[in-house]
């Protein structure tokens, strides 16, 4: 009996040990495989493999795990070169990432492991800007990017990094003023900024509980705040500090807080009553000007204060029921495109201009979104005609973007950053600066073959390509600029004073976007898969009509899990070779879910059952009672229940797990049109416009 009991215990222990030795998460293995290859497969990383393997069980060099998850990468001093790989965001359990004291070059990756607490890329040869993506990594406690070749201004991106205790940007080539969001670093203890080119004052630091501050050898000026003079370790030499007595701060002025009336927000640095009076007078004048502007225009250019329902704009929308026949448009995205060749014999779709030509082009062709030409453009039906793509000079784009300054940064993704380009005559464009490492350095064509294909894509719900720039190793695409921003901003980044999108507008956005995707899938030959459909790539024009962006760049999206982010990627798309147009349909269904619920596709801060929007919402899509509970609270119930139910039915079809059960986009468009037609007969005479004097919510 005793022997049997002993054997039972031994077997149980063996089973327990086997369960504990769980294989490393597949996505994390893939991320490390790609990283190993990108680092040029260094022999010093013992155990690492280019394909497969088990980092946790096989104890790969520098890899530490907890259970089946990789939690630390300690790779300091391995003389590593190359790049870091493009799947780092798959390492969701990683808390420590140390690549210090290596020979790494190029830009810091845009997409880093999202839950890092300690990031150390110091003592390398990294250049470019500090990535804005750091602003979303709320768990960061330590950032060390010292002793590299980083340049440009620091983005104002530190608002959410309240846990950050150590920040080291020393020995780089960073410039400009300190960002005002430094004031939000309430846990900061150590700040090293020495040996850079920072300017302005350091007043933004005065309310922080820092005990180790080094700002030596910069171009700071003004005075060292008294609050900082008692710091145990304070180094301030090599700057242009004022030798005069520092003036006392004016009553009520708090340094280190962003002022609503000042971009710098650093407070008043002069101590005279004249300056104080002047500042007060300036604020008063600004208030008067703002009141005058508000009185003159009921509708602001801001996306958050547009009066959709009482707008008096002339109707500018194509009839929602006017589906039309899809004309075939030949677009070369085939093998020739992949090889850097164009299917056309010439470059008749590309028009080169210099500075003078650019001025004429911006003045005559890129009209503002309130003029007659743009109104006519909105009413234009599908066309297979092409429009010349203008070749911009690098110097012109550098001037219009202030040398691609962080202040003009609109956003960034897995293949590059988008900047606002402002011209002296008031016109504005959007410039997508694509990562140069994505192009084969051995080929001279650069971005030209892509431009040849993109210039053929024309649809009223697709953001138009204006031109491009391929010069000195830079590859950029120039698009229309939309002041209203993206659907993502409207749904997820609005404040409590914002006017939410009405139900009618949400339906219109869904239908317009569906038509854009249908055009890519079924009017273009061969079919164009988007591979990056998400709310941040759906821009909204002056009248809140959708314009799909980032199309025709699928060659750069080797793994859609990298660029789409969590929540949008279709289940089958984990295997890049399995991506089909039906995978685009799934992503579009997720966007419709965002319109319905107002939630983001994945929210790691919610309880586990609610983190994935699709998994949480899908079981409730066919329950009419549950639908009212998951509908966006910002709608305040102002929607017809039948319309909500039909909208949910379409979503349920789009997000089917098996791609063969999802409808093609043409059927999605037809379903949305039928939904509009069946919901209210009153829409027959009003389908040409989505604006009415009184919105009856009858979709």
Curated annotation (Swiss-Prot):
Cannot functionally replace STRUBBELIG. This is Protein STRUBBELIG-RECEPTOR FAMILY 5. Its main location: membrane. The lineage of its organism: Eukaryota, Viridiplantae, Streptophyta, Embryophyta, Tracheophyta. The keyword Flavoprotein does not apply. Residues 295-699 are cytoplasmic. SUPFAM superfamilies: L domain-like, Protein kinase-like (PK-like). Expressed in leaves and flowers. Disruption phenotype: No visible phenotype. It comes from the Eukaryota.
């Amino acid at each position: 009996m005793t022997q049997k009991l002993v054997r039972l215990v031994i077997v149980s222990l063996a089973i327990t040990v086997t369960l504990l030795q769980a294989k490393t998460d597949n996505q994390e293995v893939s991320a490390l495989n790609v990283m190993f290859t990108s680092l040029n497969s260094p022999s010093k990383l013992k155990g690492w493999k280019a394909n497969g393997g088990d980092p946790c069980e096989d104890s790969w060099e520098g890899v530490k795990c907890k259970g089946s998850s990789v939690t630390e990468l300690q790779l300091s001093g391995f003389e590593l070169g190359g790049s870091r790989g493009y799947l780092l965001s798959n390492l969701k359990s990683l808390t420590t990432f140390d690549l210090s004291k290596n020979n790494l070059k190029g830009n810091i990756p845009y997409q880093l492991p999202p839950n890092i607490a300690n990031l150390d890329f110091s003592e390398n040869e990294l250049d470019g800007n500090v990535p804005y993506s750091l602003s979303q990594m709320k768990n960061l406690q330590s950032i060390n990017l010292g002793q590299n070749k980083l340049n440009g201004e620091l983005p104002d991106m530190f608002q959410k990094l309240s846990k950050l205790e150590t920040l080291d940007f020393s020995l780089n080539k960073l410039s400009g003023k300190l960002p005002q969001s430094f004031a939000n670093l309430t846990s900061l203890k150590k700040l090293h900024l020495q040996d850079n080119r920072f300017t302005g004052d350091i007043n933004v630091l005065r309310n922080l509980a820092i005990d180790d501050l080094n700002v030596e050898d910069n171009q700071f000026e003004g005075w060292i705040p008294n609050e900082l003079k008692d710091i145990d370790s304070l180094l301030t030499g090599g700057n242009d500090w004022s030798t005069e007595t520092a003036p006392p701060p004016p009553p009520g002025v708090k340094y280190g807080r962003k002022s609503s009336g000042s971009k710098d927000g650093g407070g008043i640095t002069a101590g005279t009553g004249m300056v104080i009076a002047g500042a007060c007078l300036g604020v008063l004048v600004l208030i008067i000007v703002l009141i005058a502007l508000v009185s003159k225009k009921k509708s602001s250019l801001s996306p958050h204060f547009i009066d959709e329902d009482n707008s008096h704009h002339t109707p500018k929308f194509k009839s929602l029921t006017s589906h039309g026949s899809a004309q075939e448009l030949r677009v070369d995205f085939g093998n020739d495109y992949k090889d850097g060749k164009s299917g056309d014999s010439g470059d008749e779709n590309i028009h080169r201009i210099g500075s003078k030509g650019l001025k004429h082009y911006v003045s005559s062709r890129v009209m503002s979104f309130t003029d007659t030409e743009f109104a006519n453009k909105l009413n234009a039906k599908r066309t297979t005609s092409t429009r010349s793509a203008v070749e911009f000079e690098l110097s012109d784009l550098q001037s219009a973007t202030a040398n691609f300054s962080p202040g003009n940064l609109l956003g960034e993704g897995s293949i590059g950053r988008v900047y606002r380009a402002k011209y002296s005559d008031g016109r504005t464009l959007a410039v997508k600066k694509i990562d140069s490492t994505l192009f084969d350095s051995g080929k001279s064509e650069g971005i030209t073959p892509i431009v040849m294909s993109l210039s053929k894509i024309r649809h009223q719900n697709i953001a138009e390509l204006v031109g491009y720039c391929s010069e000195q190793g830079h590859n950029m695409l120039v698009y229309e600029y939309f002041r209203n921003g993206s659907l993502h901003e409207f749904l997820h980044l609005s404040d409590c004073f914002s006017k939410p999108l009405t139900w009618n507008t949400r339906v219109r956005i869904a239908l317009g976007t569906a038509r854009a995707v249908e055009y890519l899938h079924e009017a273009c030959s061969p079919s164009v898969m988007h591979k990056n459909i998400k709310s941040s790539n759906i821009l909204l024009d002056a009248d809140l009509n959708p314009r799909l962006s980032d199309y025709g760049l699928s060659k750069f999206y080797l793994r859609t899990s990298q660029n789409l982010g969590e929540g949008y990627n279709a289940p089958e798309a984990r295997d890049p070779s399995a991506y089909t147009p039906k995978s685009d349909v799934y992503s579009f269904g997720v966007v419709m879910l965002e319109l319905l619920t107002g939630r983001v596709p994945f929210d790691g801060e919610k309880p586990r059952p609610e983190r994935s929007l699709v998994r949480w919402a899908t079981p409730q899509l066919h329950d009419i009672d549950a639908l009212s509970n998951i509908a966006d609270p910002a709608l305040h119930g102002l929607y017809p229940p039948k319309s909500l139910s039909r909208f949910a039915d379409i979503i349920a079809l789009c997000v089917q797990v098996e791609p063969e059960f999802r409808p093609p986009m043409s059927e999605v468009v037809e379903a949305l049109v039928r939904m509009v037609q069946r919901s209210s007969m009153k829409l027959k005479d009003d389908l040409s416009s989505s604006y009415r004097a009184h919105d009856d919510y009858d979709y």
